[in-house]
A protein has these predicted regions:
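Glycan-recognition surfaces in beta-rich domains, encompassing non-catalytic CBMs
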Residues: 1-129
Length: 129
């Protein structure tokens, strides 16, 4: 069986991303595609993709928290804190997945780095390999 591998940038506004909770939209030229979603309460963003790897593109800053990222039932915690603002950052990257269909879920945890002033998480885009 063979699979078509996607090589693309999936923007936060893509209808194939399933959102729960109250995500808000920040509009700016500093974001990939001109927008970035953010949330600071219970919420998830889920996307099914075909490929062997994925990157989470997000905004990092001094008021961001820790996101829970789940890929095919494996859990990773991603700290979006940065002392200075960093837009379009590769916040998380995973390669070496078996060729096929996978699911990524990004979830607000309420957790934060001790240096952070807040616990919001962001989603700017996914990059599929």
């Amino acid at each position: 069986m063979s699979y078509k591998v996607e090589e693309s940038l999936i923007q936060d506004s893509n209808a194939a991303i399933s959102y729960t909770g109250t995500w808000k939209v920040a509009t700016s030229t500093k974001h990939s595609g001109g927008t970035c979603k953010y949330v600071s309460s219970a919420a998830t963003a889920t996307y099914k993709f075909t490929g062997t790897g994925i990157k989470l593109i997000a905004s990092k800053s001094s008021d961001k928290g820790i996101a829970k990222v789940t890929i095919d039932s494996k859990v990773y915690y991603v700290d979006l804190y940065s002392a200075s603002a960093k837009d379009q950052s590769v916040a998380f990257s995973l390669s070496g997945l078996t060729s096929g269909t996978h699911t990524i879920k990004v979830e607000w945890t309420g957790l934060k780095n001790n240096s952070s002033k807040g616990n919001a998480i962001t989603l700017d885009a996914f990059e599929i390999n």
